[in-house]
Amino acid sequence: RPAAASGKLPAVVVVHENRGLNPYIEDVTRRLGIAGFLALAPDALTPLGGYPGNDDQGRELQSKRNSEEMTQDFIAAAELLQKHPLGNGRVGAVGFCYGGGIANTLAVRIPAVIAAAVPFYGRQPASEDVPKIKAPLLIHYAELDTRINAGWPAYEQALKAARVRYEMHL
């Protein structure tokens, strides 16, 4: 929460890459607070002791976590923010790499909670799940990330068919 903020704030759950809550994601979260958001960045590695201090070990640790349990952790974070007394009930999700996929997943799984999602180069949801998305999306892909980008044409087609508001940047 920004020190100078007054009143209820929009909230953002910030989802890290596939290596835990590293200093970069902590800084993104801090900057969102400065910008006037109630921001929360859970560490998926908390059950294993938290981010170990370097990304290589973080990747190794995260590979040991159950994927659905991690997803449930981020769902719980978004639901907590929606009900937080300092928040205004509106919750966005932003994620990077693995976290971009989770931002998409949150938009699918908890559409009554997620008011906006901003995935950075995350995996796309299954086409049949896209109609569940009610939030506008601001999607970012990296030009040379051919693995993730390969899913974009089908995702875009599903977004258009479901009339989901989106903007994509490559």
Predicted features by range, described:
Residues R1-L86:
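Serine-hydrolase catalytic machinery in alpha/beta-hydrolase-like enzymes
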Residues N22-E26, G49, G101, E128, ...:
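Short N-terminal helix/helix-N-cap motif within the alpha/beta-hydrolase-1
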Residues R31-I34, E143-L170:
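Active-site-adjacent alpha-helix of alpha/beta-hydrolase-fold enzymes
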Residues L40-P42, F120, H169:
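The conserved SAM/SAH-binding core of class I Rossmann-like methyltransferase domains
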Residues I75-K134:
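Primarily recognizes the serine-hydrolase "nucleophile elbow" in alpha/beta-hydrolase
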Residues I133, I139-Y141:
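Short beta-strand/loop motif that positions the catalytic acidic residue
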